Structure formats: C-alpha cells, structure tokens
UniProtKB/Swiss-Prot annotation:
The keyword Iron applies. GO terms for cellular component: mitochondrial intermembrane space. Electron carrier protein. The oxidized form of the cytochrome c heme group can accept an electron from the heme group of the cytochrome c1 subunit of cytochrome reductase. Cytochrome c then transfers this electron to the cytochrome oxidase complex, the final protein carrier in the mitochondrial electron-transport chain. This is Cytochrome c.
C-alpha cells in the first residue's frame, strides 16, 4: 500500500484538474470519484460516460486501478480520459492509497 500524503500530492498535480473526491462533489471534465472503490466503470451518477467506459464492466479496486492508471486508454480503449497515465509504480500506489481514503469519507 502506498503513502496517503504522497498520493494526495499526486492527485493535486495530476488529477484534480478534472476530478473531485468529496462526497457529493461536482463533476468536472471527469467524474467525481466519491464512492469509487467497489463501483463498476462508468457508473458515477450524473456523469456522461463513453460507451467504452459503461460496457467495460470491471469493478474499481486497488488492482484494477493500478493497471488502469498506468495507461487509461490501453485499459479502456475509447475512454474520454485524456490523461496519459502514471508510469511510476510508487506514484500509482500512493495515489491509490489516497483515493481509497478520500473517496470513502
């Protein structure tokens, strides 16, 4: 498991332009991530997803996020997420630790 505080920095630098994590937070270019863990792809209420995201059918957890965050367009071809991914394993682990904590509060 990664470091939550380091993960928060990764989120602010690489994710917060398009995503929020607060419960009942607003969608931006990307969906609000509250309740992310245990939810299927393409299921955040009120966000308009691509068919690729809606039909992927995987459940978000530490393992699926770890693979997805390395290369989102490879994991879900057709996603509208324009982020290239995080190649460093440590950064991904830190980000996932932060997301696990912040999206369940």
């Amino acid at each position: 498991m990664g470091d939550v505080e380091k993960g928060k920095k990764v989120f602010v630098q690489k994710c917060s332009q398009c995503h929020t994590v607060e419960k009942a937070g607003k969608h931006k270019t990307g969906p609000n991530l509250s309740g992310l863990f245990g939810r299927k792809t393409g299921q955040a209420p009120g966000f308009s997803y691509t068919d690729a995201n809606k039909s992927k059918g995987i459940v978000w957890n530490q393992e699926t996020l770890f693979v997805y965050l390395e290369n989102p367009k490879k994991y879900i071809p057709g996603t509208k997420m324009i982020f290239a991914g995080i190649k460093k394993e440590g950064e991904r682990k830190d980000l996932i630790a932060y997301l696990k904590k912040s999206t369940s509060e």
